[in-house]
Amino acid sequence: MPTIDIESAIWNSGYENIACCDEVGRGCLFGSVLAAAVIMPKDVIIDGVKDSKKLSHKKREQLYEIIKEKSLAIGVGTVSSEIIDKINIKNATRLAMKKAILSLKDKDGNIVAPDYILIDAEEIDVPTPQSAVIKGDDLCHGIAAASIVAKVLRDRLCQRWEEEHPNYGIGQNKGYGTKAHREALKEHGPSPMHRKSFLNKIL
């Protein structure tokens, strides 16, 4: 279970607003990559927070509401399939994370600037001090919270995308390359929201 050990060491070094960041959708064939950043109050732990992939849909939704209530700030950044194809998924992921950090706002809509950033296994191009945490969503409470926010928000987008592009089962597969999704691609061809650079081995 993730702890606040990493955050505590940074708080004890004199930093206050630690933004924790994670992404979802990096490996998808369809749709944007989405990153979320979360600033939690010092020493606050939300029971049950862990890597979003290890939680049920219902539990993620419940925890998302608690994270929204207890966090100091949340930011979200997305990068479209078109941009992913132009700059590659690694750069697109970093860009989404940068957007999330720069869009951090409190409940009143005020911009909140972090003084330290913890990121799941990445580094981003901002002047703020930062650390990349390998397996961050397993180890770091704040990164796990960010993973939940990112997963919930992207899953909600997938439901909307399903309505706009009904042939691919996006509401169920979330854009990942399941067997049914690959077969639908062969039958219908790619939609404008598919990542063309990901489809070379499929089509």
UniProtKB/Swiss-Prot annotation:
The keyword Cell inner membrane does not apply. It holds the Pfam family RNase_HII. It is an enzyme of class 3 (hydrolase). Residues 16-203 form the RNase H type-2 domain. The keyword rRNA-binding does not apply. It catalyses: Endonucleolytic cleavage to 5'-phosphomonoester. Its cofactor is Mn(2+); Mg(2+). GO terms for molecular function: manganese ion binding; RNA binding; RNA-DNA hybrid ribonuclease activity. InterPro entries: RNase_HII (IPR022898), RNase_HII/HIII (IPR001352), RNase_HII/HIII_dom (IPR024567), RNaseH-like_sf (IPR012337), RNaseH_sf (IPR036397). Keywords: Cytoplasm, Endonuclease, Hydrolase, Manganese, Metal-binding, Nuclease. Belongs to the RNase HII family. This is Ribonuclease HII.
